[in-house]
């Protein structure tokens, strides 16, 4: 999502079907963020959404990184890509994983900001290197 709005608008219940609509709403309730726009956007193509859901489930929550580190990586990617929606969504999710407001401010500064552990600095540096 950019300042101008989404390039592809999230689908309505009619666009995405009852199951995807329910998944997006339940996900939003569980995370405290409201209906998940990403789910409703990808859900416009049901096969894409199902494949993405399997993929994303292997990364989060089924990934090998601890949840806090996963959230730091997602926040850094969202910041570098200028994706305000994803950034704000994961600020909320990150709080549950132990990401503080100070961490969020440092994510914006990047891996050279003070206060990161050596491991966190490596993860954020990897994000920056993959981005550039």
Predicted segments, located by residue:
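Acidic/histidine-rich alpha-helical segments that form the ligand environment
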Residues: 117-132
